[in-house]
Swiss-Prot record:
Its EC number is 5.4.3.8. GO terms for cellular component: cytoplasm. Transmembrane segments: none annotated. This is Glutamate-1-semialdehyde 2,1-aminomutase 2. Pfam families: Aminotran_3. Pathway: Porphyrin-containing compound metabolism; protoporphyrin-IX biosynthesis; 5-aminolevulinate from L-glutamyl-tRNA(Glu): step 2/2. The keyword Ligase does not apply. Keywords: Cytoplasm, Isomerase, Porphyrin biosynthesis, Pyridoxal phosphate. Homodimer.
Length: 429
């Protein structure tokens, strides 16, 4: 058993300083029954906690670190740029360079606006969609997280296409009533919502691969159907690619699945581990954003040199071959975990999209939030604790996916599979 004494002491202090001792709720490790593990450093695919324990990391700061920790080229570029100034509140050439890479690689993006987080990106995209269409309502999908903007913190009602109720205190009902929540991968529900409210629906916002109910890819025809119905009713289609952007494919999920939205939200990978977000799309729509148009959005640190540098240096190193390697390694990890679980009769379903993997403790196919919730959460928590003791750092939530980086070696994958087999044996012992 590993010692976490220093992490425990650090957490005892942290709870006196921050709500719940953390700056983002899932980091509290509540769903897995552990004290949060405090990290000290990372290198490549490995991270090290303040007690000196080493882990193979499949969290990667919740996705951004596609090159692994402390990539030498990213670090060197950040040092060079930081010495020249960390922020100016004025344009820099670095913004141009990252914007050009994004526009070159994301099929639907003709113009892009940089912001500071994924939440800013989705909030801004929704404001733009409402301003452009002059409509109020949006459709989102049950179990999909698009940041903590008021319009998006909504849970589904009990019926199909039910108007949302606030999912957090502090979200006014007057805001929630404009959000329609339907099941993911359920095109009929979307069509029904449009039949009822179509003239007032500004946009559908969707993760092309759902990443906050585990990893749930779209069923065949789902994204294409969303594209068709939004065009039919004059609404915008927004892809939230904060998680999938440059993770699923060189051209993002929209390139992989061959469906182009009107607006795209990005984050995570395009900041290389620094705070960043972006939203972009067709020029006709994006030109409505101030100062070109009347839809206002601004940010003190938007496009800051450090985030632009980390993002540029990260994207510059990614090639189409990178994603072939990701698919090979992810397929091997999926296969190995499946074989280990089968051997010990562990109920499981594994979903995969690019370098994202979702492991669910259920035999039911996981295609939406309801089926994701059939996973055995107690078994997941036990699995999580045992894997941590084996030196595998996983997301401390059943409803988050695993991420691979270019730094993960074949040896890392094989060790992870062997560790899972040992854990499954103990869980069934």
């Amino acid at each position: 058993m590993r010692s976490y004494e220093r992490s425990k002491a650090a957490y005892e202090e942290a709870v006196t300083l921050m709500p719940g001792g953390v700056n983002s709720p899932v980091r509290a490790f509540k769903s897995v029954g552990m004290t949060p593990i405090f990290m000290a450093r990372g290198q490549g695919a490995k991270i090290y906690d303040i007690d000196g324990n080493e882990y193979i990391d499949y969290v990667l700061s919740w996705g951004p670190l596609i090159l692994g920790h402390a990539d030498p080229q990213v670090v060197e570029a950040l040092k060079r740029v930081a010495e020249q100034g960390t922020s100016f509140g004025a344009p820099t050439l670095l913004e141009n360079e990252l914007a050009k890479l994004v526009i070159e690689r994301v099929p639907s993006v003709e113009i892009v606006r940089m912001v500071n987080s994924g939440t800013e990106a989705t909030m801004s995209a929704l404001r733009l969609a409402r301003g452009y269409t002059k409509r109020n309502k949006i459709i989102k999908f049950e179990g999909s997280y698009h940041g903590h903007g008021d319009s998006l913190l909504i849970k589904a009602g009990s019926g199909v296409a039910t108007l949302g109720l606030p999912d957090s205190p502090g979200v006014p009902q007057s805001v929630a009533q404009h959000t329609i929540t339907v099941p993911y991968n359920d095109l009929d529900s979307v069509r029904y919502a449009f039949e009822r409210f179509g003239e007032d629906i500004a946009a559908v916002i969707v993760e092309p691969v759902a990443g906050n109910m585990g990893v749930v890819p779209p069923v065949p025809g789902f994204l294409e159907g969303l594209r068709d119905v939004t065009k039919q009713y004059g609404a915008l289609l927004i892809f939230d690619e904060v998680m999938t952007g440059f993770r699923v494919d060189y051209h993002c999920a929209q390139g992989y699945y061959g469906v182009e939205p009107d607006l795209t939200c990005l984050g995570k990978v395009i900041g290389g581990g620094l705070p960043v977000g972006a939203y972009g799309g067709k020029a006709e729509i994006m030109e409505q954003v101030a100062p070109s148009g009347p839809v206002y959005q601004a940010g003190t640190l938007s496009g800051n040199p450090l985030a632009m540098t980390a993002g540029y240096e990260t994207l510059r190193q990614l090639t189409p071959e990178t994603y072939k390697e990701f698919r090979r390694k992810a397929a091997r990890l999926e296969e190995g975990l499946h074989q280990a679980a089968e051997k010990y009769e562990i109920p499981h379903t594994i979903n995969r999209a690019g370098s994202m993997i979702g492991f669910f403790f259920t035999n039911e196919p996981v295609i939406n939030y309801e089926t994701a919730k059939t996973s055995d959460l107690e078994l997941f928590a036990a699995y999580y604790r045992e894997m941590a003791n084996e030196g595998i750092f996983l997301p401390p939530s059943q409803f988050e996916g695993l991420f691979l980086s270019t730094a993960h070696s074949d040896e890392d994958i094989e060790y992870t599979i062997a560790a899972a087999e040992r854990v499954f044996a103990r869980l069934r012992g």
